[in-house]
Amino acid sequence: MAELKNDRFLRALLRQPVDRTPIWIMRQAGRYLPEYREVRAKAGDFLTLCTTPELACEVTLQPLRRFDLDAAIIFSDILTIPHAMGLGLYFSKGEGPRFERPVRTKNQVSALGVPDPESDLSYVMEALRLTRRELDGRVPLIGFSGSPWTLACYMVEGGSSKDFALIKGLMFEHPQVMHHLLEILAQAVTVYLNAQIAAGAQAVMLFDTWGGALSHRDYRDFSLSYMARIVEGVVRENEGRQVPVILFTKGGGLWLETMAGTGCDALGVDWTVDLAKARMQVGKQVALQGNMDPCVLYASSERVRQEASEIIKAYGAGSGHVFNLGHGIHPTVMPEKVAALVDAVHELSVPYHTYEE
C-alpha cells in the first residue's frame, strides 16, 4: 500500500502532535453533492449503490475532490450486517430502511448466524480495497459499523422507530433473548471490522445512533458493554501502524467517562455536549471528535467560520481533537458551506498546535 501523505487524522486520534486540527464530516459522501446524486441516479437505488464496489468507491472519493478533508469514510450503510443475516433490507420512500423479516422471538434470534465478510459482505471489502488503491495514500480510510444495540433496534422494530416500543418491550420482558441477540451482533461486528481493517481501513468507527434512547443502567448493560467487547476484539495494529477505534453514541454526553473506559481511542460527541467540559471529563484517556450542529451549515459562511472558531477554542490547545459535525450532514446543505468550514478549521486551528506538545 502507498505511504500515507497526510496522517493528521490518525495522529489526532492517538493524541499525537499535529500541525492543525483535522476535519472530516459524517455522511460527507452524500445527497448534498450534485455529483453524488448523479451516481445515485445511475445506480437506480441506494442498495445497488452500496453493493456495487466501483460506485461505492466513486462516491467515497467525491468529497475529497471538492474539499481538503483529512480522511475518507467508506460509502456503505450500517445495516449491511442484518442484511447479510437474511433479514431482507429494503428502502421505502419517506420511511427509510425497512426489513422484510424482523427478529422478535427467541427462535428467530437463535436462527441468526454471523456473516462471513469475505463472502456475505464481499462488496464492502472490495470497495475498501478499491478505495485504498485510488486514494494512493492521500488520506486515511475509515471503516465503520453500527453498534450491536443500534443494529438490534432496526432488526427488532423492522425499521426506524420513534418510541422503540418493540425492542424495549423485548429488553424488559425477555432480557436473556435481548442479550443473546446482542452477543451474536457483537461477534458479527468484531469479525466485520477486522475484515475491513484487513481490506484497508486505517481507523474504524462504531455508530451507536440509538444508544441515547436508553436509561443509564440500560445503556451500560445493553449497549456499552457490547461495544466494549468489540473494542477488545478489534485488531489494533495493521501495516505497521496503530488502528484507532472511535465510539459514537448520539445523545451519549452523560456517559463519556464510562465510554472512555472501554479502551477505545476516541469518542464522537454531538452538539449537545460542551467540548471543554468533555475534554476535562475524559482527561488524557481519549481523543474527541465533533461537535458542530449540522444546522450551522444553513447559516452564512461567516457564521460557519465563527462557529468553527468557537468549537476549536472550546477544545483548546494541543492534539486530540478531530473536527466533525455532531451527526450526519443534511442533504439540503450547500457544498460551498462545507468548503468554508473545512478552510476555517484548517486556518483557525494552527495557533492551537505546536509540534513540541
From Swiss-Prot:
Keyword Chloroplast: no
Signal peptide: none
Binding site for substrate: 27-31, 77, 154, 209, 327
Catalytic activity: uroporphyrinogen III + 4 H(+) = coproporphyrinogen III + 4 CO2
UniProt keyword annotations, A-Z: Cytoplasm, Decarboxylase, Lyase, Porphyrin biosynthesis
GO MF terms held by the record: uroporphyrinogen decarboxylase activity
EC number: 4.1.1.37
Site entry (Transition state stabilizer), positions: 77
PANTHER family cross-referenced by the UniProt entry: METHYLTETRAHYDROFOLATE:HOMOCYSTEINE METHYLTRANSFERASE RELATED, UROPORPHYRINOGEN DECARBOXYLASE
Entry protein name: Uroporphyrinogen decarboxylase
Native species: Nitrosococcus oceani (strain ATCC 19707 / BCRC 17464 / JCM 30415 / NCIMB 11848 / C-107)
Gene name per UniProt: hemE
